[in-house]
């Protein structure tokens, strides 16, 4: 029964991520149609990430007070409306406002979905189940940009947002029908003291710093890269293809993440941090389609390993009944990075070229590697 519930849950994740993936990477290009500069794109990415930063602990709190599955349904509903209202955009300011609400909706989806994985999976199977969840998520994001690129090229942005809304709506109905009635969350046990959490955060500080650097790179890829690719003449269809290739690499890494545990967390995270760094360098130095494709696949492959391995380390340092806190802390650290990353890039483009800005931002891949060495040695295995 539990396996059936997990399978249905993963289907809803796939459909929802398909709908979101169809449009999310094209919003920066859509903003450029209203005259958005790279500073504007940085601001859009920063506002979106700011919304995602304030969301995790709120969602974790709600998930602790009510059935997590209802919070999941609410998150899907928020995403549907945030996507639909993009149809009404008439300026860059409109997009900035709507991206704030879109950030809340998308982060609510990610956080509650990750909490549900920890609810439905035994502790010893969390890396494997996080990998399966990642496969469902990335399959949608893999196929979505391809469909979104074709729809945009053929029918325009308005129809893209409408179709995306319908797909997300389907996942909402699936969640209501398949998950609500039979969902069994983890039993609430006495929580650890506040001072206990402070000790955990101090012990994991290098790891959280690494996650922040990872978030900076994630914000750069999702908020800035589409506009960068568009500015050097890459079409909407090919931008969709680049993100689908990014998704293929993530998918492979998610599906095989549990195999890397035999090498140890420190070695694994150090290696993938360097892979991400090389991917960023490739994008910065060679602004042509094929090098961009290679760079995106390197980054995607690294990202696919970072998520399940890191969240497993974080969750093992929290009491089992406080998995929501572990997930929320992980997501908040990522979103702090995602908030400052696009803003830093936007400011760099004012004083130097776009390519050099990417080159300078690649240093965060090195920071990830340095924090990987320190962060995993202090974490409890």
Feature map (PLM): residue ranges:
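Helix-breaking motifs and short loop linkers at transmembrane-helix boundaries and internal kinks
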Residues: 35, 67, 88-94, 105, ...
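Helix-to-loop junctions at the C-terminal end of transmembrane segments
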Residues: 55-67, 253-265, 349
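Paired small-residue
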Residues: 93-101, 279, 290-298
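Structural signature of the two symmetry-related core transmembrane helices
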Residues: 70-84, 165, 267-281
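Helix-loop boundary and gating motifs at the non-cytosolic
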Residues: 2-45, 49, 205-211, 215-228, ...
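Juxtamembrane intracellular "pre-TM" segments in multi-pass secondary transporters
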Residues: 1-3, 180-211
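Residue-level signature of mid-helix packing/kink "hotspots" within the transmembrane helices
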Residues: 49-57, 141-142, 247-255, 338-339
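Cytoplasmic helix-loop-helix junction between adjacent transmembrane helices
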Residues: 100-137
